[in-house]
A protein has these predicted regions:
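Secondary-structure junction motif
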Residues: 185, 189-213, 276-280
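Short beta-strand->loop
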Residues: 158-168, 244, 251-265
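Short helix-boundary/capping micro-motifs
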Residues: 10-28
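Central regulatory/effector-binding core of bacterial HTH transcription factors
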Residues: 88-151
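Hydrophobic hinge/microswitch elements
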Residues: 126-131, 135-139, 145, 199-255
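Alpha-helical linker/hinge and terminal dimerization helices associated
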Residues: 42-43, 64-85
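A late-sequence structural motif
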Residues: 255-291
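A short LG(V/I)-centered, amphipathic sequence patch enriched
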Residues: 40-57
């Protein structure tokens, strides 16, 4: 069960295709198939179901995937610790879409300029999945917003995670021009909310403010970008909630109505004890950006 076999397995699990995984890895498909078969023989269980040229993880494969990803993460962490970060390596950073758009470009550009040997691998998603990915070792750290009912730093500590406040964001409801007379969330007449898929803190706050949960009048349109959400609002078809810092970056029409929705902190979370140089450099860069 060598690291290369684990990397091949994780790639095939991600692509669910030997051909695509082989292209991604720069290997021949036959060699990828052989390594997967050897890994299955070593473990003593089938990791994939193969039917009609399609692949899917078996129950054993799904369980093994989490461990394989964690083992690879630990190997990378050990390499960082032993070399003192001299060889660069990879720091896997997760982020909400809003933070990636409004806060990270300057921070990560400054980091790269100072530590060019370290590769920053950025992925985005809702806060809850990001927290889980940090907990299980799929990510080294992540910028998230904690839901009001989450329990704050104490709840993170129970998960074995540490945290540090990064930025305070002012949230706002963005409404169509037809909502010009609205003064509070209860006045909103448009009954369609544009939001990211479930698991995002901002979506939960919007649903609470607007009384979406349990309502037969409201519907939620799931979208993949703030640009699409803003366009939907401009078309008069929905409302959305977003940080004011993101709205400031957009070309939203001045005719759209905004209502303040309160502040929320963006925090950086990581596994307690995670102390590789590349991450310490990120903490230092974050501190420098805040000062």
């Amino acid at each position: 069960m060598d690291p290369e076999s684990l990397r091949i397995f994780c790639s095939v699990a991600s692509e669910l295709s030997v051909t695509q995984a082989a292209a991604r890895l720069g290997r021949a498909p036959s060699s990828v198939t052989t390594r997967i078969q050897q890994l299955e023989a070593d473990i003593g269980a089938e990791l994939f179901v193969r039917t009609n040229k399609r692949m899917a993880l078996t129950a054993a494969g799904e369980r093994f995937l989490e461990y394989a990803q964690r083992l690879l993460a630990l190997a990378d962490e050990a390499r960082h610790v032993v070399t003192g970060g001299r060889e660069g390596g990879t720091l896997r950073v997760g982020s909400m879409e809003s933070t990636a758009a409004s806060r990270l470009p300057a921070l990560l550009a400054a980091y790269h300029a100072r530590y060019p040997a370290t590769r920053l691998a950025l992925s985005t998603g809702p806060s809850r999945p990001l927290i889980e990915q940090v907990r299980t070792g799929l990510l080294d750290c992540a910028f998230v917003a904690l839901p009001p009912a989450f329990g704050g730093a104490a709840a993170l500590e129970e998960l074995g995670l540490a945290s540090r406040a990064a930025w305070r964001e002012e949230l706002c409801l963005l409404l169509p021009a037809s909502e010009a007379q609205a003064r509070r969330a209860a006045d909103v007449a448009t009954r369609s909310l544009a939001a990211f898929p479930q698991g995002g803190t901002h979506r939960g706050i919007a649903e609470d403010l607007l009384g979406v949960a349990g309502s037969t009048q409201w519907r939620v349109q799931e979208m993949s970008s703030y640009h699409t959400m803003i366009a939907c609002v401009a078309a008069g078809a929905c409302v959305t909630l977003l940080p004011a810092s993101v709205l400031a970056l957009s070309d939203a029409p001045a005719s759209l109505k905004t209502l303040p929705a309160g502040p929320i902190d963006t925090v950086l979370v990581w596994r307690a004890g995670f102390d590789v140089p590349a991450f310490q450099h990120l903490l230092a860069q974050l501190g420098a950006a805040a000062s």
